[in-house]
């Protein structure tokens, strides 16, 4: 795949392209992906904390269970199904076991549950927050919530590309 952009109009490599150049392109992309992933990871952790803090403060630690706390209650059911799968998939994680074993209802508070979210799930969660809640989180970054929503969606897309190892150039 790394050599595809180096082919000429006749779909053949020009004589000036070497295997070593294709390897260098691959290595550049691998390093670039790692750099992007490192930056995105910092953004993800920061956003995860701010969303969890705001949402839990306004709606309580189990507020994620109430569809009225979201912009689109219809999406809420899909969200809960996704979360149940994540809890099941991570059932051996120490903090999941702790809440399951030590609390009578076994429910996981949002500030802990958010740790199971993929960046894509975090992006969808933010997108389905009520406008005033999105605005409150976006204000912490000094931007409008429509900008933050768009940026988070695009960052999630780039993160997925980094994760599967596709070329970025």
Name the predicted role of every residue range.
Residues 2-168:
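Long, contiguous internal "core" modules enriched in hydrophobic/ aromatic residues
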